[in-house]
Amino acid sequence: RDGGDFNVNRSRRPCGIASPGIVRRRVPLEEENLDRIFRKQKEGSPVTERAHLSVLDFCTIYEGETPAQSIARSVELAQEAEKLGYSRMWYTEHHNMKSIMSSSPAVLIAHIGAKTERIRLGSGGVMLPNHSPYVIAEQFGTLEEMYPERIDLGVGRAPGTDMNTLGRALRRDAHSAERFPEDVKELNSYLEGKSYIPGVSAVPGANTNVPIYILGSSMFGASLAAKLGLPYAFASHFAPQHLEQATTYYREHFQPSERFSKPYVIAGVNVTAADTTQEAQEEYERVCFNRVKAFAGRGKHL
């Protein structure tokens, strides 16, 4: 069972990730061990549990770098993660950010799937209110046919961009996020071959049963995932203070569905890997700066 996704902000060295067998961490990842790990944290004891590890790739474009070079590094990162035994690679959806290349997760997955063999690939995530659930079902149904048993579909309701891009370029209306629960159910119906619309089927997509993961950083996502009986991926890489509350609620209120009889939790955390502590600290500082640049400066090179 998967325990967590690591939000790895890539360094210029494409293979700057740690071996799953030796990773030490002080954040909870294993869903079945969360309670015990939380107790250790409160007692001040170090946590060194093993977990299935994954990577969330923003596909950063560094200063002086081209989008093509960023894509090439993403391919190398996925290949190295596969060699090291990581469970999956997920790709984000952001728009109008000059330092983030990942605007179309499905296209990236299609490309990187052809360059890898086993590692699972998915979206972390598709911002569903930006899209038609039907089109997303077709896209990820296509990916599942190309790479069977390797595709994940993480969905969120955030815009993934600024308000100007949201309203004018993406043409997303102000109330689209309010339809997120219904959009998730509609999307799932297409993938299960049980379309809500008579005579309409996702081809490809129907009966592929691509697993849907609800992404969130608040109680809203936890509540929705529990109600629908879907896996839950919590964004503790930017909202760590809510991790325990959200995952505990999700597990306690989980309603089994046809596909998932038990709750399934993924926790996103920030990890910086390097050969020495000093190098890791320096890389961490660069990561913090890049995050400010991407989100506060809309990806401009500040």
Q: PLM features: what roles do these ranges have?
A:
Residues 3-7, 27:
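Intrinsic low-complexity, disordered N-terminal segments enriched in polar/charged/small residues
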Residues 37-121:
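N-terminal beta1-alpha1-beta2 module of alpha/beta enzyme domains
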Residues 38-49, 167, 173-202, 241-302:
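An alpha-helical appendage that flanks or caps ligand/catalytic pockets
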Residues 48, 109-117, 144-150, 226, ...:
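Acidic (Asp/Glu)-rich catalytic clusters
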Residues 49-67, 129-192, 232, 240:
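Flexible, glycine-rich active-site loops centered on histidine and acidic residues
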Residues 53-57, 89-91, 121-123, 151-155, ...:
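Hydrophobic faces of well-ordered beta-strands that scaffold small-molecule active sites
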Residues 226-234, 238:
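A conserved active-site cap/scaffold subdomain adjacent to cofactor or substrate pockets
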